[in-house]
């Protein structure tokens, strides 16, 4: 991967090695209408939330001012992760196997469990990077599955 000289100068040796050894396994993107998610929540309530989102995600989204937008963003994130894996909803993967978490600054990250984690191990995915954005009408997400050498683990 080529980085312009001014960017390379800012990177530490560790970052340089990480960039050199990085491989892209897959990319995925998704967009969803927030109204669609709002209607699913209205129609199916707790059943829908419990089927699609983890307790941590429900707690986070429910505490937000625009909770529907946050639920829609997580929906789009889960879909984009599946696309980055290249599997769709096959191979024993469920909605709750993919969890969106946020650090103290709000940066989202992906935690994998169950079938999603197993598939990523088989694909030698070291990290699943995610970007989420939303407004009143739509939410979108972009996922990048980053590869690892066979000896590394996802932890």
Q: What is each stretch, according to the model?
A:
Residues 2, 14-155:
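Core catalytic alpha/beta fold that binds nucleotide/phospho-ligands
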